[in-house]
């Protein structure tokens, strides 16, 4: 900074001024010396840099930086970018101009930019953060040139050459013209200064890659679409087209049919004439600029045109979208969703446009003012509730006073309200009136409730224009203007008609109501998602379409074993989509213990308040009601006849059923939907009333992906910095208190939705919402720490370093998901992925390869199993104790990112009949909800022993085995059985005790023997894995230690050896410390000083060598001399015999049986015994199975 600046008064230094300016783009290749140039008009420069003297503004000796955000194209420009002011243009088009000349970041748009305004803010150089890492993609030839250069040289070239024009400031997405490169990523902020400490990483661009610019993709798409009407453009007679401007009443040269789509949000139109400011914005229609020449008649932006639709017509104003945009398609006219609903247009509708006279006049020149308008409420739970009445009538009044509404008979008028605020004001008003107890003549002292704040709208009240009176001559479109000063508004009754559907119009999003998950969008992108929603919608639409023919008395039960799965969200979404009148009742609010009649009266009162005034109607346009009873198991609970109060519970359930049946019989335009979280607690009599039951499950990976998309897009699509300064308004920034909650978020491009969905297995949508909130807090905390380290305020760091957005990085979500798992694992049963890697396991390479073949194939190539091929998902580990069976199962879960369930035998046992089997079912159901998942049955022989050998009176173990077999069959059934992505791993020391049915193909069909390491190399690998995190001395030779160990050492023995060695090292180190302290104390005592404590020595005198625990060879030798093997040689021989029986015994027995049959014998089995067996069975047999599981064939003559 020049010294002249430092001499200015302190309160005038580093002011940051923002304003709205005009923007101009010049893309002229002939201006070869001017590229990446930003010019400001002289007046604008002086305004945003008030601290700069006239001399500084003339010579521009000092770098000046500004933040610029282009307005009107949020698809491409939604954050502020840092630019260096190159020069001042004294001959700018306006005094408030920003001029971009051949800027590399804008060249991809060519000359298709129709932006005309931007927000510009001056910033000080000290506010710009430094970039630590910069990732730049360059072409192969540039990469080859720069690859062999030292990093210091490359960094100097970037600062002094490549980024010279931008003042060494660069950001993500910027184009570096000198090397034809693009900045792919910058850390820790999205834009900043490249310094001598910045780590620059070059990425070689792959030729013919598909990573094209979005705008180019849109151009290609538009070109393909426009080919359909290419012929009409070729045959367009230019002379006829121009002459039509002289004869405006003549028909269009050619009538172009346009598709219709709803506007996603209310579009603001800049620079409207003052006379148009009161126009009805619902009659503003929009199209892409390229559509205007194709209409066949001269029309300009903002002209009035005649819209032809469904053999009817109306007058609207036509505007064009600001370019560039990628949200709006060609050959499409975008209308307000309210206008679409009033015109009853669908996705298949097509409209045409015609010219009219006085096209640049306001609507008041075309439509007469209505003398009186009759408005009725449309029946809904909002309009029929008295507590909201004052609020929505006040909002209706505001709607008609804000603009001159243009309406037709039958039009819908929506009014949004804040229900919480409305109820609060209603209760407050009643309380004030009760306290004052107004007497006649004291009404003037009553509180004035005429002006009601808007709040945060969360519901909509619909009104309908029932009748309009006024002069209708020369009004072919039957449109009238409601002028509050001239039109009499009459409120008349309630209309029991169907609400406007939301499936095509999307009026719910347009009115900015609280976002609701869009199931249709998710199902369209992935048809296998949310099958229960498709089933539910099918039932509802069938009932809706058949009500005029037959009363189906539809009742639906939504059941789930877990809360927060989206039952209520689905009901609300489908009701809004189809235009149904939803009556939502929480059964917790209806319960009055000991007062059945009061409960029934409360239920009927809430329903009759909404539908009691309506007569039963089978008209398809009449309102259709949905009664939704949440938590029905609390109102109609299952009772045990032996419990106290069982008769009262049963009586209440019967009365509720009777009441619901009466409504179903009286109203054919009504259905009842109930939800419960525990089907076993629901009264059996009520279950007999239910016709359809839909079961909800925890979202699978694809469904979680769609939920994450919705939640993240909802945060990133919020309006940001909508409070932009007005033109010529100079606003001083960074002065007010900063509220970080008003800042919007953005997702960095390396955050993968698929990865988030995979990591969040087993979590509900409610849990995913908490993850988003946690990720927001983590991102803010990360930026606060960065701001403190950079000595920059948080507000400046967010606006300058991140363009006014808080950018999520992958670490935010990774930590949020891990925290969610750790925090909610006990409450929601979310399983955790253990942290055991392959490196922690040694000496099991062959077993590891077998596991990779069994599990890796179904996970990476599920399409191979889609044609009915059964996958092998069951693995059984057996062998001596301490050989790593449990550890290997955990490593499987970690390596493949699978969730992990560990099941012990006693956990399944329960004293009540049937509960033990239910526990087995719950374990597998939790695994299905958390898939991809591994279920690990430790000590499987205690869970599933041979049936018939147990002496328990109830046969519990036999039933557990049978249930386990049934569940295992479901696991191997693929996606249809719900076992897709679930793997079952068992571990046992005694496979000979297992039930034989467990070992057949399709269950535990992959048996892997985990034995003891029989070579020194394998034992040394185990030691390497166990000591991976140890600090070993140089004299430690693990191979030498392994040679000193016998071949009866198991993995557990080696673990004990390493643990004892570490303990020995710690003891030895502690003794050495004690000796040092003792010696020091002796010296201090001899000097007459006070002895020191151990704690003081560690805090003040200890060195790092004193604290480090270094394991020596002597520690291993000492531990080895004290350790005895846990498995004897005789026991190992037994396990080898068991292995021989399971892996080689059957094949050997079959071979021996074949040989014996050829010799006419029966392998030593008496002939009389075989005949006796055949008599008992009643049929011939081909052999028997001995006690070891060997199949022995009978002789050929039997």
Curated annotation (Swiss-Prot):
Gene3D superfamilies listed in its UniProt record: 1.10.8.60, P-loop containing nucleotide triphosphate hydrolases
Enzyme Commission numbers on file: 3.6.4.-
Binding site for ATP: 879-886
Record flagged with keyword ATP-binding: yes
Record's signal peptide: none
The UniProt record lists the keyword ATP-binding: yes
GO biological process entries: protein import into peroxisome matrix, receptor recycling; protein unfolding
Enzyme class: hydrolase
Localization terms from the record: Cytoplasm, Cytosol; Peroxisome membrane
Location (main, coarse): cytoplasm
Catalytic activity: ATP + H2O = ADP + phosphate + H(+)
Entry-linked InterPro entries: AAA+_ATPase, AAA_ATPase_domain, ATPase_AAA_core, ATPase_AAA_CS, P-loop_NTPase, PEX6_4th_dom, RecA-like_PEX6_r2
Keyword vocabulary terms for this entry: ATP-binding, Cytoplasm, Hydrolase, Membrane, Nucleotide-binding, Peroxisome, Peroxisome biogenesis
Record's function text: Component of the PEX1-PEX6 AAA ATPase complex, a protein dislocase complex that mediates the ATP-dependent extraction of the PEX5 receptor from peroxisomal membranes, an essential step for PEX5 recycling. Specifically recognizes PEX5 monoubiquitinated at 'Cys-6', and pulls it out of the peroxisome lumen through the PEX2-PEX10-PEX12 retrotranslocation channel. Extraction by the PEX1-PEX6 AAA ATPase complex is accompanied by unfolding of the TPR repeats and release of bound cargo from PEX5.
Known partners and oligomeric status: Interacts with PEX1; forming the PEX1-PEX6 AAA ATPase complex, which is composed of a heterohexamer formed by a trimer of PEX1-PEX6 dimers.
Protein name: Peroxisomal ATPase PEX6
Chain's gene name: PEX6
């Amino acid at each position: 900074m020049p010294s002249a600046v430092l001499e200015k008064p302190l309160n005038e230094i580093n002011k940051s001024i923002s304003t709205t300016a005009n923007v101009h783009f010049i893309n002229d290749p002939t201006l070869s010396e001017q590229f990446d140039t930003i010019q400001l008009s002289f007046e604008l420069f002086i305004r945003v840099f008030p601290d700069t003297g006239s001399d500084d503004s003339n010579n521009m000796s000092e770098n000046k930086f500004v933040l610029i955000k282009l307005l009107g194209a949020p698809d491409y420009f939604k954050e502020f970018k840092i630019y260096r002011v190159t020069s001042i243009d004294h001959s700018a088009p306006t005094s408030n101009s920003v001029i971009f000349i051949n800027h590399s970041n804008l060249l991809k748009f060519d000359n298709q930019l129709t932006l005309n305004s931007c927000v510009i803010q001056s910033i000080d150089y000290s506010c710009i953060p430094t970039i630590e890492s910069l990732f730049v993609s360059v072409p192969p030839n540039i990469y080859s040139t720069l690859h062999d250069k030292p990093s210091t040289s490359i960094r100097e070239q970037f600062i002094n050459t490549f980024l010279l024009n931008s003042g060494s400031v660069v950001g993500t997405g910027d184009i570096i013209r000198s090397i034809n490169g693009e900045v792919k990523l910058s850390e820790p902020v999205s834009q900043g200064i490249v310094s001598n400490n910045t780590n620059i990483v070059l990425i070689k661009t792959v030729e013919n890659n598909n990573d094209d610019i979005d705008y180019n993709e849109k151009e290609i798409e538009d070109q393909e679409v426009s080919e359909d009407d290419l012929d009409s453009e070729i045959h367009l007679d230019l002379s006829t087209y121009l002459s039509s401007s002289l004869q405006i009443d003549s028909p269009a040269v050619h009538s172009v049919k346009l598709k219709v789509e709803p506007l996603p949000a209310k579009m603001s139109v800049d620079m409207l004439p003052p006379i148009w400011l009161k126009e009805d914005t619902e009659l503003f229609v929009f199209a892409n600029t390229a559509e205007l020449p194709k209409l066949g008649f001269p029309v300009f932006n903002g002209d009035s045109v005649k819209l032809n639709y469904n053999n009817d017509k109306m007058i609207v104003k036509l505007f064009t979208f600001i370019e560039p945009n990628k949200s709006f398609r060609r050959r499409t006219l975008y209308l307000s969703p309210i206008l679409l609903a009033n015109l009853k247009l669908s996705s298949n509708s097509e409209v045409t446009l015609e010219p009219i006279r006085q096209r640049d006049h306001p609507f008041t020149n075309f439509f007469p003012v209505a003398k009186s308008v009759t408005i009725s409420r449309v029946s809904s739970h909002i309009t029929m509730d008295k507590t909201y009445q004052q609020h929505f009538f006040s909002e209706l009044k505001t709607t008609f006073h804000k603009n001159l509404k243009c309406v037709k008979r039958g039009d819908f008028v929506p009014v949004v309200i804040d229900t919480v605020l409305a109820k609060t004001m209603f209760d407050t008003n009643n309380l004030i009136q009760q306290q004052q107890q107004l007497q006649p003549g004291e009404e003037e002292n009553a509180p004035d409730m005429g002006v009601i704040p808007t709040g945060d709208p969360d519901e909509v009240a619909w009104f309908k224009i029932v009748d309009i009176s006024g002069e209708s001559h020369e009004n072919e479109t039957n449109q009238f203007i409601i002028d509050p000063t001239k039109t009499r508004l009459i409120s008349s009754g309630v209309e029991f008609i169907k609400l406007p559907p939301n499936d095509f119009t999307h009026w719910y999003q347009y009115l900015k109501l609280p976002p609701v998950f869009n199931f249709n969008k998710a199902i369209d992108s992935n048809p296998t998602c949310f099958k229960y929603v498709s089933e539910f919608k099918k039932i509802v639409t069938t009932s809706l379409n058949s009500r005029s023919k037959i009363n189906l008395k539809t009742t639906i039960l939504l059941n789930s074993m877990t809360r927060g799965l989206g039952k209520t969200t689905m009901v609300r979404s489908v009701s809004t989509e189809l235009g149904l009148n939803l009556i939502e009742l929480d059964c917790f609010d209806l319960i009055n213990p000991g007062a059945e009649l009061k409960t029934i009266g409360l239920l009927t009162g809430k329903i009759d308040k909404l539908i009691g005034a309506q007569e039963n109607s089978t008209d398809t346009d009449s309102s259709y009601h949905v009664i939704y009873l949440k938590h029905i198991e609390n109102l109609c609970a299952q009772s045990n006849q032996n419990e106290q109060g069982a008769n009262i519970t049963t009586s209440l359930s019967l009365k509720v059923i009777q009441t619901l049946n009466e409504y179903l019989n009286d109203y054919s335009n009504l259905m009842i939907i109930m939800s419960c979280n525990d089907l076993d607690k629901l009264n059996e009599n009520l279950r007999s009333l239910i016709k359809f039951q839909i079961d909800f499950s925890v979202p699978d990976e694809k469904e979680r992906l769609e939920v994450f998309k919705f939640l993240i897009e909802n945060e990133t699509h919020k309006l940001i910095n909508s409070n932009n300064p007005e033109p010529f308004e100079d606003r001083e920034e960074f002065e007010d208190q900063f509220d970080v909650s008003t800042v919007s978020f953005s997702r960095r491009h390396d955050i993968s939705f698929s990865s988030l969905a995979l990591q969040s297995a087993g979590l509900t949508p409610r849990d995913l919402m908490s993850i988003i909130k946690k990720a927001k807090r983590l991102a803010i905390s990360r930026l606060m720490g960065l701001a403190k380290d950079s000595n920059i305020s948080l507000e400046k760091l967010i606006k300058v370093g991140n363009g006014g957005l808080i950018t999520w990085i992958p670490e935010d979500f990774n930590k949020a998901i891990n925290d969610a798992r750790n925090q909610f694992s006990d409450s929601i049963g979310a399983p955790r992925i253990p942290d055991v890697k392959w490196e922690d396991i040694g000496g099991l390479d062959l077993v590891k390869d077998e596991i990779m073949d069994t599990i890796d194939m179904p996970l990476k190539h599920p399409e191979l199993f889609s044609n009915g091929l059964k996958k092998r998902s069951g693995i059984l580990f057996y062998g001596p104790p301490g050989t790593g069976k449990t550890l290997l199962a955990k490593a499987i879960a970690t390596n493949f990112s699978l969730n992990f369930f560990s099941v012990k035998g006693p956990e399944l046992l329960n004293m009540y009949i049937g509960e033990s089997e239910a526990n087995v079912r719950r374990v597998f159901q939790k695994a299905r909800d958390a898939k991809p998942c591994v279920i690990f049955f430790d000590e499987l022989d205690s869970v599933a022993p041979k049936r018939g050998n147990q002496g328990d009176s109830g046969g519990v173990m036999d039933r557990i085995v049978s249930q386990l077999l049934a569940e295992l069959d479901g696991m191997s059934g693929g996606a249809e059985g719900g076992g897709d992505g679930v793997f079952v791993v068992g571990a046992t020391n005694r496979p000979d005790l297992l039930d034989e049915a467990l070992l057949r193909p399709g269950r535990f069909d992959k048996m892997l023997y985990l034995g003891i390491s029989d070579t020194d190399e394998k034992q040394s690998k185990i030691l390497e894995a166990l000591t991976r995190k140890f600090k070993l001395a140089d004299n430690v030779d693990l191979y030498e230690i392994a040679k000193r160990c016998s071949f009866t050492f198991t993995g557990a023995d080696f673990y004990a050896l390493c643990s004892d060695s570490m303990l020995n090292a710690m003891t030895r180190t502690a003794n050495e410390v004690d000796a040092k302290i003792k010696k020091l104390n002796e010296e201090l005592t001899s000097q007459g000083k006070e002895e020191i404590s151990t704690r003081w020595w560690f805090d003040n005198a200890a060195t790092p060598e004193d604290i480090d625990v270094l394991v020596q060879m002597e520690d291993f030798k000492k531990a080895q001399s004290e350790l005895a093997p846990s498995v004897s040689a005789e026991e190992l021989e037994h396990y080898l015999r068991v292995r021989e029986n399971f892996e080689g015994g059957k094949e050997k027995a079959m071979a021996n049986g074949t040989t014996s049959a050829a010799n006419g014998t029966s392998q030593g089995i008496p002939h009389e015994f075989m005949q006796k067996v055949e008599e008992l069975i009643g049929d011939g047999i081909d052999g028997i199975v001995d006690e070891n599981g060997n199949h022995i064939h009978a002789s050929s003559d039997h």
